[in-house]
Curated annotation (Swiss-Prot):
Matching Pfam families: Mqo (PF06039)
InterPro entries according to UniProt: FAD/NAD-bd_sf, MQO
Top-rank taxon: Bacteria
GO molecular function: 2-hydroxyglutarate dehydrogenase activity; L-malate dehydrogenase (quinone) activity
Protein name from the UniProt record: Probable malate:quinone oxidoreductase
Gene: mqo
Length: 525
């Protein structure tokens, strides 16, 4: 009997060993690094385009959407350039450049179509759980700023995408739009505002959770939480060997081979990209800027304000510094956020290491980062000013947008880290970029997303662009073309300038997502 038990034990041990070896040497079609909105979006696209592909997702936290995608770690703005004045700079001749605003708006229309398709197919659930109509407003004071906003509004009316926007310099009208902004304000102050009813508040954390929840029902998808990617190296057959540490087992490391790797790890993407050794990654650096918000959950205050009210950013400051007073729907409640206020640490992630910035330095990015530091005095000045702010200073900033605010109603909340891109530049040595950028190997076998703004709002178009880059041949096939046009009905077409298409697409997404809709009319002289 003892011999039989020993034999059974040995066979079981052998079986476990064989299974571990198989796991150690397994090859999958796709590895997604990071459990945020970007990886969730790409994973969803790929599952719908290639249902038989095997996909592994690795996330270092014990849940998805715990970093920048979490609803509390970002402003939740569905960035459409309705209110964000940094997307419409004034040119030297005094005219307003709306080209960036059009691009941002077109991008968000793609996101709306992607989410609508997922709702129709029960991938995403009740739309109200993740997106709600909240008017987007621009608000300014002072003669120069009022003149700028007046010109901005006029310029945007030449685009079909911004028709339906309202403009006013009348205090009573603006008070109807945003009473908290006007109550207690000096009646002699010259003010102006625009209001776009098509604005939205989006909870990207909820979207991420719902996308990943659906993916986990697919036997070809495997979610690995509390797993940290430590290394990425190319194999002889041009696949990638990804080394992963299981944080629930004292960091025990295993490897997985992948035909394609996406690095969507937010602020941690740069250091992982550097480990790949691909020449395309050389010269990239990163600069982390954190954010804090003042928050009130007092329903008596929150229920008086239904808008995202954007002001003007300080000269030289990053886009994420634009002050705004926002209606948010978080954890089933309506709350107000004001900010952001910049913070600085060496961390690339909210739950990262203080040494992240130091570890990212290399011989290829040291000079670009040095040049950026020397050439961006306005940014340095802005950050120093922000870091010197105390509670009274932050409250004074809030009172510029909410004159009758009471300090006792507000608390300070630390949001996520925004890691800005620094690129090598032949002319200037280094450039600081505030957007997002896909960096991929020449053969398309690995890609990373770097940068911050506009970020999550444009996850669907960014991942679409990534697929067009790394799966170029696949995207060109009739099968992928047909499916992509099913997911994104406007795929291959620009909405700007096409009134019929704009109304058709917005009517469709507004209906599915239960959002406000305004029919676009021809431009009036």
């Amino acid at each position: 009997m003892r011999k039989i038990l020993v034999l059974i034990f040995c066979l079981n041990l052998f079986g476990v060993t064989q299974q571990a070896a198989a796991e150690e040497n397994k090859t999958v079609d796709v590895v997604l690094i990071g459990g945020g909105i970007m990886s969730a979006t790409l994973g969803t696209y790929l599952h719908e385009l290639e249902p038989n592909w095997s996909i592994d997702m690795y996330e270092r936290m014990n849940g998805v959407a715990e970093e920048s995608s979490n609803g509390w770690n970002n402003a939740g703005t569905g960035h459409s350039a309705f209110a964000e004045m940094n997307y419409t700079p004034e040119k030297k001749d005094g005219s307003i450049d709306i080209s960036k605003a059009v691009v941002v708006n077109e991008s968000f229309e793609i996101s709306r179509q992607f989410w609508s398709y997922q709702v129709k197919n029960n991938v995403l659930k009740d739309p109200k759980s993740f997106i709600n109509s909240v008017p987007h407003m621009s608000f300014v004071w002072g003669d120069d700023n009022v003149n700028f906003l007046r010109k901005r509004y006029a310029a945007l009316q030449h685009s079909t995408l911004f028709r339906g926007m309202e403009y006013s310099e009348d205090a009573n009208q603006i008070k109807q739009w945003a009473p908290l902004v006007m109550d207690g304000r000096d009646p002699k102050q010259k003010i102006a505002a625009t209001r776009m009813p098509l604005g939205t508040d989006v909870n990207f954390g909820v979207i991420t959770h719902q996308l990943v929840d659906t993916l986990t029902k697919n036997p070809n998808f495997k979610l690995n939480l509390s797993h940290e990617v430590r290394d990425i190296k190319r194999n002889d057959d041009n696949t990638w060997r990804v080394t992963v540490a299981d944080l629930t087992r004292d960091g025990k490391e295993t490897t997985v081979n992948a035909k394609f790797v996406f690095i969507g790890a937010g602020g941690a993407s740069l250091t992982l990209l550097q480990k790949t050794g691909i020449p395309e990654a050389e010269g990239y650096g990163a600069f982390p800027v954190g954010g804090q918000f003042l928050v009130t959950t007092n329903p008596e205050i929150a229920n008086q304000h239904l808008a995202k009210v954007y002001g003007l950013a300080s000269v030289g400051s990053p886009p994420m510094s634009v002050p705004h007073l926002d209606t948010r729907m978080l954890d089933g409640k309506r709350v107000l956020l004001f900010g952001p206020f910049a913070t600085f640490s060496g961390k690339f992630l909210k739950n990262g290491s203080l040494f992240d910035l130091l570890h990212s330095l290399s011989t290829s990015n040291l000079m670009p980062m040095t040049h950026v530091g020397l050439d961006n005095f306005d940014l340095v000045k802005y950050l120093v000013g922000q870091l010197m702010m105390n509670d009274d200073d932050r409250f004074a900033a809030l009172k510029e947008y909410f004159p009758e605010a009471k300090q006792a109603d507000w608390k300070l909340w630390t949001a996520g880290q925004r890691v800005q891109i620094i690129k090598k530049d032949d002319e200037k040595g280094g450039l600081l970029q505030f957007g997002t950028e896909v960096v991929s190997a020449k053969d398309g076998s690995i890609a990373a997303l770097l940068g911050a703004s506009p970020g999550a709002s444009t996850a669907a178009p960014i991942m679409l662009h990534l697929m067009e880059t790394v799966f170029k041949d696949k995207v060109a096939t009739p099968e992928w073309q047909s499916k992509l046009k099913e997911i994104i009905p406007s795929y291959g077409h620009k909405l700007n300038g096409d009134i019929e298409m704009t109304n058709k697409i917005r009517g469709y997404t507004s209906s599915v997502l239960q959002l406000d809709y305004i029919e676009v009319k021809p431009e009036t002289n």
